[in-house]
Amino acid sequence: MAFNMKNRHLLSLVHHTEREIKYLLDLSRDLKRAKYAGTEQQKLKGKNIALIFEKTSTRTRCAFEVAAYDQGAQVTYIDPNSSQIGHKESMKDTARVLGRMYDGIEYRGFKQSIVQELADYAGVPVFNGLTDEFHPTQMLADVLTMIEHCDKPLSEISYVYIGDARNNMGNSLLLIGAKLGMDVRICAPKALLPEASLVEMCEKFAKESGARITVTEDIDKAVKGVDFVHTDVWVSMGEPLETWGERIKLLLPYQVTPELMKRTGNPKVKFMHCLPAFHNSETKVGRQIAEKYPELANGIEVTEEVFESPMNIAFEQAENRMHTIKAVMVASLA
C-alpha cells in the first residue's frame, strides 16, 4: 500500500496506522535535531494556516505559531471574540470560507463533531488542537518524550494514566498506546473510566499491534513497574468549579504523590502532565480550591513535591508539542 501523508487531516489518530504514527514521530525527531543544530530547512514557505481557538491555550497556540514560523508559514489566530464563528456563522460555512483562503486549519474547542465538520467541508487539511474527546497532537508529544527518556523499545515501554480517565487525555493515551503496541494502563474510579465503546475499539487495535491494555480501579495493579506516570487536571476546561466536591472525593486516592511514585517499584520512573497543572495554590484556581479544600493546598492532581522533583519531565513534554506539531504540518502541507 502506498505511503503518503500529504493533505492528511489529524483528527484523533483513530484512522492513522501504526506506521504513519511512527513516521510522524521520526519526522518530529529529525525536525527537533535540525532546530537544535541550526540546520532547519523551511518547507512551508508561502503556506497560510488558520488557527481557530474556541478554548484558551498557551502551549497549543504557541507550538503551532512557532512551528509554522520556523517552517516559513504564516498564521492567523481566530477566536470567538474576533470572528463570527458560532455567533452569526456556522462551522460548516466557516470551513467553506477558510478553506478557500488557507492551506490548513487548526481547531481547538469542544465537540469532536465540530473538528470533523471542519474536515468534511474545508477542502484543506484540518488539525485537531484539542476537543473534549481527543488530543492527538499532545499524544505525539507524549510518545516522543517517552522515547527520549526510556532506552527500551517502544513496544516494551509501559505507562499509566491515573485520575479522571473520561477526558481527552485518558481517551487519547489509551488510543495511542493501543495503536503503537505499548503497555498502557488506565487507572481511575469506576465512574471516571473511559467509555466501554472506546475501550472495545482500542482492544481491537491492541490485537493488531500487540499492545497490552489494562483498565482498572486498582492503583497498585496499574502502577506496578511502569516507566511513566501520567495525570491531568481533575476538572477540565469548561466544567464549573461546583463539580470539584464530588470529583475530589472520588479522585483523592489517585493523586500523584511521592508515595504513589514509589509504589511503581521503578527508581527511574518519570512523571508526565500535559499542563497546566495544579501542583500548588499559587494560581487563582489553585487558591480557590485550597480555600475550600485545605488538604489540597500542596497540589491537586499532583503534589508540589513530585512536580518540582527530577521525576517531572512535563516541560520537555511541553517543548515537544512544537516539534511534533511541526512534523504534522510538514508531513501534510509541504
Swiss-Prot record:
Organism taxonomic ancestry: Bacteria, Pseudomonadati, Pseudomonadota, Gammaproteobacteria, Pasteurellales
Main location: cytoplasm
EC number(s) reported in the record: 2.1.3.3
One of the protein's GO biological processes: arginine biosynthetic process via ornithine
This protein's encoding gene: arcB
Catalytic activity: carbamoyl phosphate + L-ornithine = L-citrulline + phosphate + H(+)
InterPro entries from the UniProt entry: Asp/Orn_carbamoyltranf_P-bd (IPR006132), Asp/Orn_carbamoylTrfase (IPR006130), Asp/Orn_carbamoylTrfase_sf (IPR036901), Asp_carbamoyltransf_Asp/Orn-bd (IPR006131), Orn/put_carbamltrans (IPR002292), OTCase_ArgI (IPR024904)
Subcellular localization, as worded in the UniProt entry: Cytoplasm
Keyword Cytoplasm: yes
Binding-site list for carbamoyl phosphate: S57, T58, R59, T60, Q84, R108, H135, P136, T137, Q138, C274, L275, R321
Function field: Reversibly catalyzes the transfer of the carbamoyl group from carbamoyl phosphate (CP) to the N(epsilon) atom of ornithine (ORN) to produce L-citrulline.
Record: residues binding L-ornithine: N168, D232, S236, M237
MF annotations from Gene Ontology: amino acid binding; ornithine carbamoyltransferase activity
Stated family: Belongs to the aspartate/ornithine carbamoyltransferase superfamily. OTCase family.
Species of provenance: Haemophilus influenzae (strain PittGG)
Keyword field: Arginine metabolism, Cytoplasm, Transferase
Name listed for the protein in its UniProt record: Ornithine carbamoyltransferase
Record bears the keyword Protein biosynthesis: no
A single cellular component GO annotation: cytoplasm
